[in-house]
Design a protein with these regions (language model features):
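FIC/Doc superfamily catalytic core
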Residues: 1-305
Length: 305
């Protein structure tokens, strides 16, 4: 037998390049693309507040819908799909669907990411991961073993990506966190590169993709670009091949593709998020119209935000 068929032989784990001191020059065309995407996100954010009003009680439910849309899309990237009914039951702890429970855990991860966005340190990322894999042995813990992506679960030989050795993970994460603390890059560029580096490090035994995408939202919020969740993962989901190819290119030293993918996904998220806001506002208007003539203190009015 060959070494590959036996799953034995030499392999090379990734040693990620340090980011904290690297200078990233964003070419003019890409800078314009990113600026356009960021403008779209800001416009969506403003539209949500204007359409419903910054203090409108429906903005809370709308934020929840957007957050769940992002969480479900991020989970779907990992082949975890679930219907709305099962997701609702899982949130009430009444679903037997493992996928539904996983998506609810992703919602909790996103909630933690947004709650901790102002101070993204290692503890914050471990907390996000602990929410995602709650109840498992590895929840909220950096891995202590080698992990890889693709081919066989038994051996790293022939894998698409072999993550850094476990002993190199703490230092790689500290470098990433120092990079995240910088303030000299466009937010979307910053988040895209941080995400790709996180996926390169693969700091956990499981849940790296979902935690890494939650990290993106923590940065978009913490750095002041967004106050409402835009379903960026829904945009990534429309072209998974390009997303995974961009991550591979980043590991090879080319950051441009992953920045381009996040710019594209951000524009999609802005359009999708705006549509969701408009749909909710329209539905509320229709429901109020149906209640015309019903006295203001009737129980039916309490159902509407």
């Amino acid at each position: 037998r060959s070494a590959r068929s036996r799953g034995t032989g030499a392999y090379e784990a990734t040693l990620p390049a340090a980011l904290v001191a690297q200078m990233f020059a964003v070419p003019g065309g890409l800078a314009a693309d990113v600026a356009d995407a960021e403008t779209a996100l800001v416009a969506f954010d403003a539209h949500a507040a204007t359409r419903l009003g910054a203090d409108h009680p429906a903005l809370g439910p709308m934020s929840a819908v957007l957050l769940r849309t992002e969480s479900a899309s991020s989970s779907q990237i990992e082949d975890l799909t679930v219907g709305a009914r099962q997701l609702a039951l899982a949130e009430l702890d009444e679903s037997r669907s493992s996928n539904a429970r996983a998506v609810v855990a992703n919602v909790r991860t996103m909630e933690a990411a947004l709650r901790l966005a102002a101070e993204l340190d290692l503890e914050a990322i471990l907390t996000m991961h602990a929410e995602l894999l709650a109840g498992t042995e590895d929840a909220g813990r950096l891995r202590e073993q080698l992990v890889w992506v693709g081919r066989s679960g038994l051996s790293p030989l022939g894998a698409v990506h072999i993550a850094p050795e476990a002993e190199d993970v703490p230092a790689a994460m500290q470098d990433l966190l120092a990079f995240i603390a910088r303030d000299d890059l466009p937010v979307l560029v910053h988040a895209a590169i941080a995400h790709a580096q996180f996926e390169t490090i693969h700091p956990f035994t499981d849940g790296n993709g979902r935690t890494g995408r939650a990290l993106v939202h923590a940065m978009l919020s913490g750095k002041g670009l967004l106050s409402t969740t835009a379903p960026v993962s829904a945009g990534l989901l429309t072209n998974l091949g390009a997303y995974t190819t961009a991550l591979t290119a980043f590991r090879g030293g080319d950051a441009r593709p992953i920045v381009e993918e996040f710019a594209r996904a951000a524009r999609y998220a802005a359009v999708t998020g705006t549509r969701l806001v408009d749909d909710l506002a329209g539905q509320l208007a229709e429901d109020r119209e149906r209640l015309t003539g019903v006295r203001r203190h009737a129980l039916a009015w309490t159902v509407l935000p």
